[in-house]
UniProtKB/Swiss-Prot annotation, chain B:
Biased composition (Polar residues): 790-800
Alphabetically ordered keywords of this record: Cytoplasmic vesicle, Epilepsy, Golgi apparatus, Membrane, Phosphoprotein, Protein transport, Transport
UniProt feature, compositional bias: Acidic residues: 691-700, 716-727, 775-784
Organism: Homo sapiens
Biological-process GO terms, alphabetical: anterograde axonal transport; anterograde synaptic vesicle transport; clathrin-coated vesicle cargo loading, AP-3-mediated; intracellular protein transport; intracellular transport; synaptic vesicle coating; synaptic vesicle recycling
Record-given protein name: AP-3 complex subunit beta-2
Recorded disease: Developmental and epileptic encephalopathy 48: A form of epileptic encephalopathy, a heterogeneous group of severe early-onset epilepsies characterized by refractory seizures, neurodevelopmental impairment, and poor prognosis. Development is normal prior to seizure onset, after which cognitive and motor delays become apparent. DEE48 is an autosomal recessive form characterized by onset of seizures in the first year of life. Affected individuals manifest global developmental delay, intellectual disability, absent speech, and poor, if any, motor development.
Residue ranges with Low complexity bias: 279-295, 704-715, 757-774
Gene3D superfamilies linked to this entry: Leucine-rich Repeat Variant (1.25.10.10)
Family: Belongs to the adaptor complexes large subunit family.
Length: 287, 1082
């Protein structure tokens, strides 16, 4: 919400107070009663000292969930050695607690966190002095903090890609083969693997057979994408086939880059561990 | 949106089947043809009594406005509804009004009275939104009304309304800039506001209306710095950029004396970044040490700004991080700028738009402060998924960061980039390699070889770019590279890119003496294809021909003439012109010749090598993070960042009358500490004692007076003491009057006091050792505290019964060795820490009066002189940590011998103690002469209970059974904590652990300092700063168990008050409540 171009309210809790987010139930109710999603109460949240939290929050089930999500971002050269790799993490929370709870979250190994940025609710001084996250949470979903794990720590990339892509000068056919395999996954399965690669302009089409998953090649954008799914360590997924190149043209001298995305559930790659979560300020037991 | 289906159904119902168009979504078009009948419908709907119809109509009208259709003819119908009860309709009417009021000014006036009514609404939200809409209506006639409304709202109770007032200021200013002076008054008033809600908005108004009135900021500077962290994010951005400008005008450049700094003060105060006060201290020492050299001393306010903005680097908002980064870049000393690098690198993980802006700024920063980003080199490596703009900016940064040590890795990275599919990026990479080669001499040959290899690349663009870069590189050292030029000459057959061809031709022409055989041949080829060439190539062909004609006219004379003739008839006049000009110069004609003699000099003059520079080189004259910096052009409304002043303007303009800023007091504290004079006589010369005269100065029996301050005088026994008392009293009141400038008074008064002391009037002397005086909750007193506290021990142990006439010096000898002055550094550091905490506290109204405890309760009798056969013993709780064991309460035992014979061998005999209680005995006093007195310190661990410690006091001849029972208030030690910590701790100690009692405060103790004094006299607690003036908070820990004791006194008007004690030890809590209430209500 802006006033004369200056942001007046950007906190989602206040905005939700003004216009309630649509839910199925509310849509039904609105249809019947003819009311709208526009809040009929004055947005008192703007007046509060903790603008991120609505007042008078009530839940029958008090619960709080915290998700630690970490991303590895790595550049790997064609021989498989890591050029740069960094771990970026966020802690997303879904807090549904009655009243004005005051939470503290502590880590087993807070030293890991090299660079952090907080939701404004986090008390910075507590973090500076004790490395504890102390905060009055906003209601609902929010991003508690995002952090960066120092680049000094070597990052073990949990997957590898074997590739063999070759263009021959004379023929109009090229060979293409990729295999994806797990590496240091600590017993967890690698899921949601997708491989995408931008092929050089000279590639007209590709005829490939995957050992699992589905693949598509867009001859216009020259984008190859392969949806692999889970990796079974016994039977590594691979994608093999040939590329048909523009006849007569010399072989393309660019190297296609391969982008690989994957997910591992229940694993924080940096080894970050949450120690405990305490709640103060409210009398009920949340969990 | 989910509302859509419901809404269309509604409409179907209301409009009836006859008008099916009604069912359309208002935004879908078609129904808003410029048919006036439609508007009649709307008018009808607006005129009905049904809110739902009105709402419907308003929705459609607003949708029309959004689509750019004219809905102004509905104005009268809409304005009527401004008084509608339905909030939703009202809101939409407001939207309409803001859009059309300017066009229909007369009619708009009809709505004004509604807003004026709204401005008086009891609900702050309605007041605020009435003002918001009123100020958005751009009708010049209502300017006076708006002005009035803004002025009124600026002094509204609700900070939210005041915030809205601040928002309204720029709106009014843009409507009528003649109001500036009045508006500045309002801004000035709002700037003084202490709430975080207002701060951001008013600074925004300040920036819009009167950015040049920097003098308005002075008084509020420290407040803004301290509030900054709690302001909402958008406000932070505005405040930070305003403070950057402010600091540039008010402080000296931290980099001006770099060289001096390095050797002198670097360690002294850069090392103490986090500890401001310490820094300030060493500043002063540095200044004192080398006044002649005048090293740069950072203004404490400058430091305050840097320190308070630093945590904001951790903000989730990229704008705030960027704002802090530019602040540090522009204001911080070189050594500290580095902290921003990490945060900026973090922003690179954000959306590409954010990345773009951040990288632009990083590129500028990395030119000036390369070292800052070097550790993060790898973070700027390019990802294949980056958009081209980002890639090019990252390249820029990588090139800026490249140096002797990291160039191999950078070049290897560049090599990979060259094979990218993004051709623009490849071209940029080649240029980057060129820049690396020029900047770092060591790798020039490697780069050149690499570039030459690229010449065989199949991609023309790559080759062309390489040629251009090679040309620039070769210009630096042409002699050694004949081979490369030959190679390039061969390329002319293949390369088609005009720029590259032109570059090659220029190179051959320039260095034709290195390739004497090939050059004419190239010219021959070019002459053949001359007509087909691009203009830029043609020009270079003429150029080449001219140069060859001058150096090798035998072989090329004909060719040159041929080329010139071709050019003479070229379509492009530029080329024709050039040809004519060249011919006149080089071909000697009959009459001319003056010029042609110098033709060689003209054409083949040695040319300076081009400098390959970053395009970000001189962007830093724009304020980083600004739009102007991003565009590299001055945007409208850009405020030039002023240069540092030569001389620092007077820093005292920022002083606020009320000394509520811990920081300034800190500074003064330091000053005081340095003066030996003070530390010597501090204890004896406290000029600030309140009406309360110290119990210790009085005769032994006057022990009760301690708990009731101010009553000491009346209860004093001996007459001569009384006189002293009166004197004291007079002086005390005097110093009370002058509490405000107590410090200056101090200096003046000390001599007087000294004189008195030397006149052996030890009554007044020891009385002044009282630290009770320091409770007058003035921050200035607080400064004295650590110093005086550290010195407190000797005087208090010295203080002897009044009846004995012993001079101070003699007493010194009697001070038992076990009486150790509390180690000053420890105390200083704790109180410092507390001070610093006070600084960052949210509420600025705080008086950070973290009073340290007062030297305990008055004397209690241990052994009466009759019972003790001449030996009188009494004790006091000194409230200092006992040196041997931190869990022990230190008790000062005062012996005085009023018998005729010396008492020998005073010691503690076998104590009979309840479980848990232990005693650290005092060393044996060998002899106490008649009339003499002595003091010893013993430690007692009471185990957090008020049980009495019973023990025997033995002399050589007798044994006395004595017992010491501690008041509950002595079983604890003060703890320093901030308000927030206090609240948090209090939150943990609810329910059973909380004891609340109501009481009536008598008239005598309604003033702040009396309450504080009474509480701290009763219990050894530390004051916790508190936001509201009627609440007093104290905190302590029990000595043995270390459990927290939190005391809150909530004084309401008319004397009613509520006392709350939170403690795990409920017994202690209950007793404490009782004691405090007794003390307060007496």
């Amino acid at each position: 919400m802006l006033d004369n171009g200056f942001p007046l309210a950007t906190e989602s809790n206040i905005l939700k107070e003004l216009i309630k987010p649509p839910t199925i139930l509310r849509t039904v109710v609105n249809t019947i009663t003819g009311s709208t999603n526009v809040g009929d109460q004055l947005p008192t949240g703007q007046l509060s000292v903790v603008p991120w939290r609505r007042t008078g929050v009530k839940y029958t089930n008090n619960e709080a969930y915290f998700d630690v999500i970490e991303e590895i971002d790595a550049i790997i050269d064609k021989s498989g050695s890591t050029i740069t790799a960094e771990i970026q993490g966020v802690i997303d929370a879904c807090v549904k607690l009655t009243g004005m709870p005051d939470l503290t979250l502590s880590f087993m190994n807070p030293r890991l966190l090299d660079d952090v940025s907080f939701h404004p609710c986090v008390r910075f001084k507590r973090w500076e002095s004790e490395r504890i996250l102390s905060f009055i949470p906003p209601d609902g979903n929010f991003r508690l903090l995002s952090y960066h794990v120092s680049a000094q720590n070597l990052v073990a990339i949990p997957v590898y890609v074997k590739h063999n892509i070759s263009f021959r000068d004379s023929s109009s056919l090229g060979r293409f083969e990729i295999t994806v395999g797990p590496k240091q996954t600590m017993g967890k399965t690698i899921e949601g693997v997708t491989v995408t690669s931008q092929m050089p302009k000279g590639v007209l089409n590709m005829s490939l057979t995957p050992s699992q998953g589905t693949h598509t090649f867009d001859p216009v954008t020259k984008m190859l994408s392969w949806d692999v799914g889970k990796i079974n360590p016994q039977k590594l997924p691979s994608l093999k086939g040939t590329m048909s190149l523009q006849a007569g043209a010399s072989k393309p001298d660019e190297n296609p880059t391969i982008n690989l995305q994957f997910k591992i559930q229940q694993l924080a790659i940096s080894g970050l561990k949450v120690n405990r979560l305490d709640m103060y300020g409210e009398k009920y037991k949340p969990f | 949106m989910s509302a859509a289906p419901a809404y269309s159904e509604d409409k179907g119902g209301s409009a009836g089947p006859g008008e099916p168009e009604y069912g359309h979504d208002p935004a879908s078009g078609g129904i808003f043809s410029s048919d006036y009948k439609r508007h009649d419908d709307l008018k009808e709907m607006l005129d009905t009594n049904k809110d739902s119809l009105k709402l419907e109509a308003m929705k459609r009208i607003v949708a029309m406005i959004a689509r750019g259709k004219n809905a102004s003819d509905l104005f009268p119908a809409v304005v009527k509804n401004v008084a509608c009860k339905n909030i939703e309709v009202k809101k939409l009417v407001y939207v309409y009004l803001v859009r059309y009021a300017e066009e229909q000014q007369d009619l708009a006036l009809l709505s004004i009275s509604t807003f004026q009514r709204g401005l008086k609404d009891p609900n702050q939200l309605i007041r605020a939104s009435a003002l918001r809409v009123l100020s958005s209506i751009r009708v010049p006639i209502i300017v006076p009304i708006m002005m009035l409304a803004i002025k009124e709202a600026a002094s509204d109770m609700s900070p939210y309304v005041r915030k809205t007032a601040a928002h309204a200021i720029p709106k009014l200013y843009s409507l009528d800039s003649d109001q500036k002076d009045q508006l500045i008054e309002v801004i000035e008033k709002l700037l003084a506001d202490k709430t975080t809600l207002v701060a951001g908005s008013v600074v925004m108004a300040f920036e819009e209306v009167c950015p040049e009135r920097i003098d308005l900021i002075h008084k509020n500077y420290r407040k803004l710095c301290n509030l900054l962290i709690d302001v909402e994010e958008w406000g932070q951005v505005v405040i930070i950029s305003m403070l950057t400008r402010y600091a540039r005008t008010q402080f000296l450049s931290p980099t001006q004396n770099e060289s001096l700094l390095e050797e002198n003060a670097e360690k002294a105060f850069y090392g103490s970044e986090e500890d401001e006060a310490k820094g300030a201290g060493s500043e002063e020492t540095a200044a004192a040490a080398a006044p002649s050299r005048k090293p740069y001393v950072m203004d404490p306010d400058h430091r305050l700004l840097l320190r308070n903005t630093k945590p904001l680097l951790q903000s989730r908002s990229a704008a705030v991080v960027m704002a802090v980064a530019q602040l540090y870049f522009h204001l911080a000393p070189k050594a500290e700028v580095g902290v921003i690098a990490k945060a900026l690198v973090r922003l690179l993980r954000s959306h590409s738009e954010v990345q773009y802006v951040v990288l632009q700024n990083v590129a500028t920063m990395s030119i000036k402060r390369r070292g800052m980003f070097e550790p993060y080199l790898k973070s700027f490596y390019i990802r294949s998924t980056d958009p081209t703009q980002i890639k090019i900016l990252k390249l820029e940064v990588l090139t800026n960061l490249a140096n002797e040590t990291n160039i191999p890795t950078v070049l290897r990275e560049f090599q990979t980039y060259i094979r990218s599919m993004d051709k623009d990026f490849v071209a940029a990479t080649i240029q980057a390699i060129g820049r690396c080669a020029t900047n770092i001499g060591r790798v020039r040959d490697t780069c050149l070889n690499g570039l030459v290899q690229l010449l065989s690349n199949r991609d023309e663009l790559v080759v062309a770019e390489s040629v251009v870069v090679i040309k620039k590189l070769l210009q630096m050292q042409p002699a050694q590279h004949g081979e490369i030029i030959k190679h390039l000459a061969k390329l002319t057959d293949n390369i088609q890119v005009p720029m590259a061809r032109a570059s090659i031709l220029w190179l051959i022409g320039e260095y034709c003496e290195h390739v004497p055989r090939i050059a004419p041949d190239v010219l021959r080829k070019m002459a053949k294809s001359f007509t087909a060439e691009e203009d830029i190539v043609k020009l270079q062909v003429i150029n080449l021909a001219a140069k060859l004609y001058l150096t090798n006219s035998k072989q090329t004379k004909l060719l040159t003439q041929y080329v010139l003739s071709l050019a003479k008839y070229d379509q492009n006049y530029d080329i024709r012109d050039r040809a004519r000009f060249t011919r006149q110069l080089i071909v000697p004609s009959e009459q001319g010749g003056a010029l042609s003699r110098h033709a060689k000099k003209l054409f083949l003059a040695p040319k300076p090598a081009p400098v390959l520079e970053s395009s970000f080189k001189d962007r830093d004259h724009f304020q980083l993070g600004s739009l102007s910096h991003l565009l590299n052009a001055k945007a409208t409304g850009y405020q030039e960042l002023p240069d540092w002043p030569e001389e620092a303007p007077d820093p005292s303009v920022r002083n606020v009358e009320v000394p509520e800023w811990t920081k300034c007091s800190n500074r003064e504290k330091r000053k005081e500490k340095e003066k030996p004079f003070y530390s010597d006589s501090e204890g004896e010369s406290g000029p600030t004692e309140s009406a309360d005269s110290d119990p210790e100065s009085e005769s032994e029996s006057d022990s009760k007076s301690s708990s009731e301050s101010g009553s000491g005088e009346s209860s004093s026994e001996s007459d001569n003491e009384d006189q002293d008392e009166d004197e004291e009293k007079g002086r005390g009141s005097e110093s009370e009057q002058s509490e405000e400038d107590g410090k200056r008074k101090t200096k003046k008064k000390v001599p007087e006091r000294k004189g008195e002391a030397s006149s052996s009037d030890e009554g007044s002397d020891s009385s002044s050792s009282s630290s009770e005086s320091e409770m007058t909750s003035e921050s200035e007193e607080e400064q004295l505290e650590p110093a005086s506290w550290s010195r407190k021990t000797p005087p208090s142990s010295k203080s002897a019964p009044a009846t004995k006439e012993i001079s101070l010096l003699d007493l010194e000898d009697f001070t038992p060795p076990s009486v150790q002055p509390v180690s000053p550094p420890a105390i200083v550091s704790t109180s410092l820490a507390a001070d610093l905490e006070g600084l960052t506290l949210t509420d600025s109204t705080l008086v950070p009066s973290l009073l340290s405890p007062v030297s305990g309760v008055g004397r209690q009798e241990l052994l009466h002189r009759v019972a003790g056969e001449g030996l009188a013993v009494d004790y006091t709780f000194s409230r200092q940590p006992f040196s041997g064991d931190p869990h022990m309460v230190s008790v000062h035992i005062h012996f005085s011998n009023s018998s005729d014979t010396p008492i020998k061998g005073l010691h503690v005999g076998t104590p009979k103690l309840p479980a848990g209680i232990s005693i650290q005995e005092f060393p044996e006093i060998e002899s106490l002469a008649p009339g003499e007195s002595a003091t010893a310190v013993m430690g007692i661990n009471f185990c957090d209970s008020t049980q009495a410690a019973n023990f025997q006091l033995c002399t050589q001849t007798r044994q006395f059974y004595v017992s010491i029972q501690p008041p509950v208030g002595e079983l604890m030690a003060p703890v320093f904590m901030s308000e927030n910590e206090f609240k948090k701790e209090q939150g943990k100690l609810m329910g059973m652990n909380e004891i609340t009692e109501k009481l009536m405060l008598p008239d005598t103790c309604r003033s702040d300092h009396i309450v504080v004094q009474k509480v701290t006299a009763t219990a050894n607690l530390g004051r916790v700063p508190c936001g509201t003036s009627d609440e007093y908070r104290f905190a302590g820990r029990t000595l043995t168990g270390g459990s927290l004791v939190l005391l809150t006194l909530d004084a309401r008007p008319a004397g009613a008050a509520q006392l709350t004690v939170n403690s795990e030890k409920m017994v202690i809590g209950t007793m404490l409540v009782k004691d405090v209430i007794q003390a307060l209500t007496q």
